[in-house]
């Protein structure tokens, strides 16, 4: 079955003061630091951040989800739904720490190798090498010599490949052979 390609695939980038949505077509998700979550579209990313803000009493204004007037508390603060980072009841640093603590479980792992790797899968009767580069499965071969020929990389980020391959590649349960 062919894996889906999503032209609207996005994630949250938390590099500056305010989270921002970035798209896989514009940013290399396999190498960009400080990316959180994989979302099918902007609406899904915004819904997740709003839910997180509601659960953790984070300020919509500081998150960029609604406009914030300078020197005035947000409307949610008056309702007790915001801890008050917008008006000084909570420090902006404490707000950022709470946001990062919650977002950390969604953090994307950057591709940790310099180039492609071959994941060795050994069975009783055969050995196969799965060639992977930037979280993209390029194919399976019977020898490391053949694996070197499979290093051509198509453009884009494959969210299915990332979700499927991240755990086995990082677990240490399988021998890995750098190819590049």
Residue map of PLM features:
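Conserved catalytic/ligand-binding micro-motifs in nucleotide and anionic cofactor chemistry
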Residues: 1-180
